[in-house]
């Protein structure tokens, strides 16, 4: 299932190039504020109670044709996540001149809540004279389905709800940086979406093609 938030943070299911509104399936959704926080609450309810809500979501999605995706304002599927954690070392198996040794002690950084925007929203580049270049990095994001800590590798995917596109915007060349905020976490620097794809739809998350379009151009 492909889940998204649209317009005033309604919950939708993407079918082809059309979106069906399934907000009514989520208990209490219509009483939440039509804001990023309200949308986050809806999606977190779906993630937390997906086993019990799935049949209703599938039924509701099958009853309507839906609206064209292109006619809707697509919001980030997790507009205010409690934690947006990114790793500095990704894609260890990519083609390089020299093989890379495995990384066992990863270093992480956070994206701020205000850095998160929808996949088609405008990314704002502030005046940072020290920055040599602003770089968008396409990422394959894991959406956690429950709390996890000290999880064995063999059962790691049991904690995953689904996956989504994510872009890490970085300002390169800033000298003497002591934190990641200035070059990683400013407003609009974390586009995501348009959808969360539930785990059952992707057989092997280690074998997914990740591509990036910048201003309509494939990079």
Sequence positions of predicted segments:
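N-terminal non-catalytic cap/leader segment that marks the start of a structured domain
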Residues: 1-106, 200-203
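Glycine-enriched loop-and-adjacent helix/strand subsegments that border the catalytic/binding cleft
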Residues: 75, 81-219
